[in-house]
Amino acid sequence: MKKYLFILFLFLYYSKLFSNQLEDDLIGNLSLYTIGKNETLIDISRRYNLAFPEVLLNNPTIDDPWILEPGKVISLPTRHILPKGKREGIIINKGDLRAYYFKDENTVHSFPIGIGRANWDTPLGKAVIVGKKKNPYWTVPESILEEEPHWPKVVKPGPDNPLGSRAIYLSMPGYLMHGTNKPWGVGMRVSHGCIRMYPEGIEKLYDLVEEGDKVEIVEQNIKAGWQGGVLFLEVHIMHEYGL
């Protein structure tokens, strides 16, 4: 089932894509991409630091994200307005399904994320990073075991571990940022409340952050920002995509 993502930008300019120098409220750029042979939408999306649902919904003429037409030109939504808030630590925006890490007052790193599904909503609020772990074990919560009894009580590191290769633990009990063994779930509301990231995304963020760094989870579906004296607007409506 599709639920539509609508992104509106006015008066767009161009800047850097992944690690961005902060001069105004906008980062990245909008770009076009020509599909190559045997490429899937998740291949393209990961290469450009995007979630495939946002690319799919930005290109409504694509019928199947796994079977693409070579030579077809698609647009990539690699332009973002920064969420409102103090630019320090991590801001997780449920409104556009992205995490923003402010390395300092001049540089930001942005990552696509997946968040909690219905009845397992990712909470809003403020936290700090209380720990980091490479190749984490997953102690399965009782609430998940009740819903999915096939899980063992503890899942060892490896390809079957939903936490992936890295975990960043938050002061919100039971919530963390982690990798995944199902990267196609990034950009969706599919988790049990944790913040899911691409393997390469969590590895990069893991190396950047430290214990004690601040984290704020917000939900801003409508964002506005300035660049060069011009006001820009970005709107996300029904930003969920379910399979």
Regions found by a protein language model. Give the residues of each.
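Sec-dependent N-terminal signal peptides
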Residues: 4-12
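Sec/Tat signal peptide C-region and signal peptidase I cleavage site
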Residues: 15-19
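Primarily a LysM-type cell-wall glycan-binding module
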Residues: 20-49
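Low-complexity, Gly/Ser/Thr/Pro-rich intrinsically disordered linker/tail segments
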Residues: 220-243
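Short beta-strand-centered segments at strand-helix junctions
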Residues: 191-206
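Extracellular LysM carbohydrate-binding repeats and other cell-envelope/extracellular binding modules
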Residues: 20-27, 52-89, 214-215
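Gly/Pro-biased beta-strand-loop elements
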Residues: 80-183, 207, 235-236
